[in-house]
Amino acid sequence: MGGVLTDRFSRQASLVPREKLIETTFTVVGVGAIGRQVALQLASIGVYKLRLIDFDIVDMTNVTTQGYTAKSIGKQKVSACADDILSIDASIDVQPIADRFRPIQAAHGVTICCVDKISARAAIWRACKGKCDLWIDGRMLGEVIRVLVADTCPSHSHYESTLFAQSEAHSGSCTSKSTIYTASIAAGLMTHQISRWLRGLPIDADIMFNLLASEIVVV
């Protein structure tokens, strides 16, 4: 076993630029299955300012599919998630907003969209695309993941092409088509794209990962 580490970030120093991480504001819209996992990963890698936006309340199924604890049942998701974040690092400036996303909440920095409906994604995107520096959208249906990233005009155009009508979206409710392990993998892919962006590396605009078929397609 190695010696005692006095800096908890030392083992990721070459992969996650600490200074840029500290100066960037991160906003997670929707702290359900994917959003909660992303928020916890961001806390672990050392973000300084983190906003959580969600109007929903933790219920029994969220313990299984989203990783909330039994004692959080009945609490606002943003409050429960904020508590978990502060248990990782009490110095994080975490702002829980128990509400639906409002255009006034659009901000510079990184916006991570983890809402259920295509129509909601489109509305949030319209409010954020002229303000945020990096946009990441995580989607999941059963064991199929899609991660979309936009940081430049070409990637903006590609992202907007995925905002099809809600009637064209895959059917299936978030309760019947969600697993914690798929959400955790999706969150890891999204956090990796944030790490690439922080390092000035090219982002992947579109990642499709079918876990059951063990197939991944990157655009």
Question: What are these language model-derived features?
Answer:
Residues M1-V219:
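Adenine nucleotide-associated cytosolic modules
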